[in-house]
Swiss-Prot record:
Lineage: Eukaryota, Viridiplantae, Streptophyta, Embryophyta, Tracheophyta
Function recorded in the entry: Polycomb group (PcG) protein. Catalytic subunit of some PcG multiprotein complex, which methylates 'Lys-27' of histone H3, leading to transcriptional repression of the affected target genes. PcG proteins act by forming multiprotein complexes, which are required to maintain the transcriptionally repressive state of homeotic genes throughout development. PcG proteins are not required to initiate repression, but to maintain it during later stages of development. Involved in the regulation of flowering. Represses flowering under long day (LD) conditions.
Name of the protein this chain belongs to: Histone-lysine N-methyltransferase CLF
GO cellular component terms given for this protein: chromatin silencing complex; nucleus; PcG protein complex
Gene this protein is translated from: CLF
Keyword Transcription: yes
Location of the SET domain: 747-862
Region annotation Disordered: where it falls in the sequence: 344-419, 459-514, 869-896
Organism: Oryza sativa subsp. japonica (Rice)
PROSITE patterns: CXC, SAM_MT43_EZ, SET
Any one of the GO BP annotations: flower development
Gene3D superfamilies with a match to the protein in the record: SET domain
């Protein structure tokens, strides 16, 4: 049967329509699947029967042997069932009776309080039960998740539209909490999963008949699915092919770097923009969620400048390659024999140099060629080549010393500088042509201590050389000092100048050759820089743009923070030099022009800041009234218990007007908004001195806000010893005391049995009045969600809801911290306060009075009068004031 079904051809008559042909194919597939299923089941039944036969045979033999042994045995004890029946607990077969009624009554009383064990025994065993002392049960405890910061409720945790079931302790059963039948949720249709047989029919039918609307509709009618579902299922089945799957994964891993390399920075950061929270600076923020609206600030911060610019960042730092250390080493080797000459051997050296003047010309030519090659090698910008320069220079230094000392005195002092320039002209000129930005390099780097000059003559010559390259104020001071030092050694330098004038003709003969070689070096350097610039990918250029925007022209910080593993510090420095060199010829385009624009913009911005600092400081009159907008001042002065407004950053690209979302919502613009700092609606922080932020004179404290180090002038946070570029720590007198929630400087709170009700929160250490104890954390839910959850909380006689602002309520039932167990009291020792911290409203618990260690914490829940439970209502008195607002929902805690 199975064989006939397999060999049955899947075709129909030629005259049948397309739908009939599809039905014919489906029927044939069903028959084939049914026959295969029948064969498979029959085969499994046979296999299971073979496996089961030894087990059943063994059990049958055991039962037969047991029955034989029981029938042959005459001992009644062997009958286990009879023995257990006779020895059953509390079974009494014989009991002594007494004619005396009083004794019978006593016996009954005794038997009622005892348990008799054993029936056919000669003596009865009685056990008197012992009553255990009653122990108070633990109060109800809810399993909860600890939260150190608030978290927005997940969508699947909502109770809206769901049946709420609670346990009623009075009747001892679970009940459904529902106000009306409308809240009953209809049962959702179970999603049918595709079976293996259906997958086979879909795959084989589409492969046989093709994918068309008629085929999909026919399959949908036969399988009772939607055509779109069938089409999606077929695509899934096609994608689940194991063939070549491992090869595809390996190809994806190999090409992953190339895929990101071809994209620009915005495309590569698309997913990061959705996941990264720019307010909390974390990924997958639980408070603000993902896919936030991107707000681009109008004003950007100035680039970060590193204070330790002279220290190399690593072995690939440009400071170890591009600064003229190799030139300084050449200078030291060239002048090693000239250092500190004496008057005794000076005449001998002059005489010997006059005799060897003829041979010195050839040596000078070789020296000039070596110097030109040295200049070409020094432009390679690598550490190994710098070491080669230091090894080559001592070989030709004796010849130079002999040529320099064979001349007479009598030349003017002004020739000293010209002598030094002639000695190193071939080295310096090539270096200047190939690196036009050497001035900025020298100015931005500090000379090493081991390169200090050890004599007056050497310092004078080297200072004159440096003066030809850089014009900084420090270089000018060295130039003046070097001139005075060279005046003291004028006789020695005059002799040097005569020898140089004698060999001037030989030098001029080699200048033409040197200039041609220098031009070749420049051309090679330019070609190398162009090839280096073309090797940069689009994403690397985008990261460089972002690095210039953040760190300025600091190659070390850009390579370390943004281009790690892609480009080194030297690569970044050379690419920026290539951009500057190419900008002069106007050959820039695309990203290169943007890089040049950012580099110029940073220079102009830094220059303008420097000019402003030189001017007179303008002191503005700053009071607490200028800190925020008028509605904030109105709330500060009137101290009305108005609900706080939820803050949402605005994306205004200019000064906010009447259409600003912050202005229409009734909130101030914060640092997260896109508007400039001069916006009139922006909260400007405080200018309090030292620790004066805990009084109402502080605008932040008066507006129920914490100070922000980015906004307030004197309220900042310092850490470390200043080595990382941040200010040092100050004493306690300079610490701002209005940043407790921001810095999480809470007290230690313990959890224990409360003397009032259930569990309670206790303080570990003593604190003073108005000290910050901790934060009341929980889930951020809507007011509608809070009303739904509050029905259960009210019936369970518990309260974990806390009003936060006009949009959210804090619920600490499932998630929170230990302060959720602080009980209510009409005469509390703590108080709750809603404070805005970095744009978010948070609830802080503060000490209302001095609290000793181990004391339980209480605060007034401040329930609304018509919603407060009986245990939380204040006793009515003749002088009681009702200052609460009418309620619109379930019982929720309120802050002061």
């Amino acid at each position: 049967m199975a064989g006939d079904s397999r060999n049955e051809p899947m075709f129909c008559e030629e005259g049948s329509s397309e739908s009939g042909y599809v039905l014919c194919v489906i029927d044939s597939l069903k028959k084939k699947i049914t026959s295969d299923r029948f064969v498979y089941i029959q085969k499994r039944v046979e296999e299971n029967s073979i496996k089961l036969s030894p087990i059943t045979l063994h059990s049958h033999n055991l039962s037969k042997n047991r029955q034989t042994s029981t029938s042959n045995s005459t001992d009644l004890v062997s009958n286990l069932l009879t023995k257990r029946k006779e020895d059953a607990l509390c079974a009494v077969n014989s009991r002594e009776s007494s004619p005396d009624e009083s004794e019978g009554a006593n016996c009954q009383d005794e038997c009622s309080s005892t348990v008799i064990v054993g029936g056919n025994l000669s003596a009865r065993n009685s056990v008197r039960p012992i009553r255990l002392p009653e122990v108070a049960t633990l109060p109800p405890y809810t399993t909860w998740i600890f939260l150190d910061r608030n978290q927005r409720m997940q969508e699947d945790q909502s109770v809206l539209g769901r049946r709420r079931i609670y346990y009623d302790t009075n009747c001892g059963e679970a009940l459904i909490c529902s106000d009306s039948e409308d809240e009953a949720v209809e049962d959702e249709e179970e999603k049918k999963e595709f079976k293996d047989s259906e997958d086979c029919i879909i795959r084989m039918t589409i492969q046989e008949c093709g994918m068309s609307d008629a085929v999909l509709e026919t399959l949908a009618r036969d399988i009772e699915r939607a055509p779109d579902d069938i089409k999606a299922r077929y695509e899934i089945l096609q994608g689940e092919k194991p063939e070549g799957s491992s090869k595809k994964v390996s190809e994806l891993n190999v090409k992953m770097e190339d895929v990101y390399g071809d994209k620009d920075l915005d495309a590569a950061l698309d997913s990061f923009d959705n996941l990264f929270c720019r307010r909390c600076l974390v990924f997958d923020c639980k408070l603000h969620g993902c896919s936030q609206d991107l707000v681009f600030p109008t004003e950007k911060q100035a680039p970060l400048c590193s204070s330790d610019e002279g220290t190399p960042c690593g072995i690939h730092c440009y400071k170890l390659v591009s600064k003229p250390d190799a030139i300084m080493e050449i200078d030291s080797h060239l002048l090693v024999d000239v250092e500190e000459p004496t008057s005794d051997n000076l005449k001998d050296q002059i005489g010997s140099n006059k005799k060897k003047l003829g041979s010195s010309g050839q040596k000078t030519k070789s020296q000039q060629s070596e110097s030109s090659s040295t200049a070409r090698v020094s432009s390679e910008s690598s550490e190994s080549e710098v070491q080669l320069l230091s090894n080559k220079s001592p070989q030709h230094s004796p010849g130079l010393s002999k040529n320099k000392l064979g001349a007479k005195g009598g030349i003017k002092k002004s020739t000293n500088r010209r002598i030094a320039e002639r000695i190193l002209m071939s080295v310096k000129k090539g270096q200047q042509e190939m690196s036009p930005d050497s001035n900025s390099i020298v100015n931005g780097c500090h000379w090493p201590r081991d390169m200090k000059l050890r004599s007056d003559t050497r310092s004078g010559i080297k200072d004159s050389v440096v003066s030809s390259q850089c014009n900084s104020p420090s270089t000018r001071s060295f130039r003046k000092k070097g001139t005075l030092q060279m005046e003291n050694n004028s006789s020695f330098v005059d002799a040097q100048s005569d020898s140089m004038e004698d060999t001037n003709n030989e030098h001029s003969a080699t200048d033409g050759c040197d200039s041609s070689r220098k031009e070749e070096c420049v051309d090679e350097s330019i070609c190398r820089q162009e090839a280096h610039g073309r090797s940069w990918k689009v994403i690397e250029q985008g990261l460089l743009l972002k690095g210039l925007e953040i760190f300025g022209k600091n190659s070390c910080l850009i390579a370390r923070n943004l281009l790690g593993g892609m480009k080194t510090c030297t690569d970044v420095f050379q690419y920026m030099n290539y951009i500057e060199n190419s900008s002069a010829s106007g050959a820039l385009s695309g990203v290169d022009s943007l890089v040049k624009g950012y580099m110029k913009g940073n220079e102009l911005r830094t220059r303008s800041r420097f000019v402003r600092r030189r001017g007179r400081v303008r002191r503005l009159k700053y009071t607490w009234k200028t800190a925020g907008y008028h509605f904030i001042r109105k709330r500060i002065t009137e101290r009305k218990d108005q609900p706080c407004r939820q803050y949402t950053p605005c994306g205004c690209q200019s000064a906010c007007g009447k259409q600003c979302p912050c202005l229409t919502n009734g909130t101030c613009c914060e640092k997260y908004c896109g508007c400039p700092k001069m916006c009139k609606n922006r909260f400007r922080g405080c200018h309090c001195a030292k620790s004066q932020c805990r009084s109402r004179q502080c605008p932040c404290f008066a507006a129920d806000r914490e100070c922000d180090p980015d906004v307030c002038r004197n309220c900042w946070v310092g850490c470390g010893d200043g080595t990382l570029g941040v200010p040092n720590q100050r004493g306690d007198n300079y610490e701002c005391r209005n940043m407790k929630l921001l810095l999480k400087q809470q007290q230690r709170v313990l959890l224990g049995r409360s003397d009032v009700s259930g569990w309670g929160a206790f303080l570990k250490n003593s604190v003073g009045k108005h000290e910050y104890l901790g934060e009341y954390t929980g889930e951020l839910i809507s007011h509608k969600e809070a009303d739904k959850r509050g029905k259960i909380y009210d019936r369970e006689n518990s309260s974990f809801l806390f009003n936060l602002n006009n949009e959210y309520v804090l619920d600490a039932y499932r998630m929170g911290d230990k302060l959720k167990f602080a009980n209510h009291s009409p005469d509390p020792n703590c108080y709750a306060k809603v404070i805005m911290v970095a744009g978010d409203h948070r609830v802080g618990i503060f000490a209302k009075e001095r609290i000793s260690a181990g004391e339980e914490l209480f605060y007034d829940y401040r329930y609304e009068p018509d919603r407060a439970p009986a245990w939380a209502r204040k006793p009515e008195g003749p002088g009681a004031k009702d200052d609460a607002q009418p309620s619109t929902g379930r019982a929720k805690k309120l802050a002061h």
